[in-house]
């Protein structure tokens, strides 16, 4: 069974979704993210993906208090990303109750620091965020594209023990146009040992079923749930 991970994106302390990472195209779904997290837990979900959009934009963690509220008020296993740029940021995230931290930009801009974190915290506490636009890794809240190609970028860290990769196809994110299944199949064919988490574009139960049929281990979804396009009962969440 594919692992199902709902997402909460935080902006100004609210639960929002963007379209293709565009801060000007935001939709607010709830003013109380901790209540949203509790609702996910009641539905039977065990995991939660939390993104600090303020942090991604300002290049340091911002919403650690909201993260703390979520981890205090639920028993969900929370992974947290957005604005993790320094040792202080990552410590704050873990102190606020994150079980895992998603790191993207630093793995591109400061690989030595990311390697240090792998050594310090262990590869099982870190998710490598690989946000892709036109085949290149994008950084800093998706505002900049790097020169890094996806597969070589992943290999560099897989060789260091990284097993968890959250891969977002930016052109799909928040569009409800279906996930980039061919991209994920390409990654899994190259690195079958990866615990790949697909993200972006999920629009319905059938998209999740298609990812499962393609052998993708896990999926993050947000807008499709908030817009009522996913039937949780049919997903078989217990």
How does the language model describe each region?
Residues 29-41, 86-91, 145-156:
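Short, acidic/polar
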Residues 3-4, 55-71, 85-91, 105-127, ...:
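Active-site-adjacent beta->alpha loops and helix N-cap segments on the catalytic face
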């Amino acid at each position: 069974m594919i692992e199902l991970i709902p997402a909460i994106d935080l902006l100004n302390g609210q639960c929002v979704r963007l379209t293709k990472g565009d801060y000007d195209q935001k939709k607010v779904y709830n003013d109380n993210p901790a209540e949203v997290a509790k609702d996910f837990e009641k539905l039977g979900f065990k995991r939660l993906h939390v993104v600090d959009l303020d942090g991604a934009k300002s290049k340091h963690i911002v919403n650690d208090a909201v993260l703390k509220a979520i981890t205090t008020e639920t028993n969900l296993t929370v992974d947290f990303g957005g604005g993790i740029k320094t040792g202080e940021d990552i410590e704050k995230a873990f102190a606020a109750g994150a079980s895992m931290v998603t790191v993207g930009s630093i793995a591109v801009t400061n690989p030595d620091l990311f390697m240090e974190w792998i050594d310090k915290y262990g590869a099982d506490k870190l998710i490598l965020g690989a946000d892709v636009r036109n085949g290149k890794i994008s950084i800093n809240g998706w505002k900049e594209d790097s020169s890094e190609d996806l597969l070589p970028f992943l290999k560099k860290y897989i060789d260091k023990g990284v097993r968890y990769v959250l891969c977002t196809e930016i052109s799909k994110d928040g569009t409800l146009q279906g996930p980039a299944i061919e991209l994920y199949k390409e990654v899994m064919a190259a690195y079958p040992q990866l615990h790949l988490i697909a993200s972006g574009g999920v629009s319905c139960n059938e998209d999740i079923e298609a990812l499962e049929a393609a052998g993708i281990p896990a999926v993050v979804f947000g807008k499709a749930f908030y817009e009522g396009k996913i039937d949780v009962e049919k997903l078989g969440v217990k």
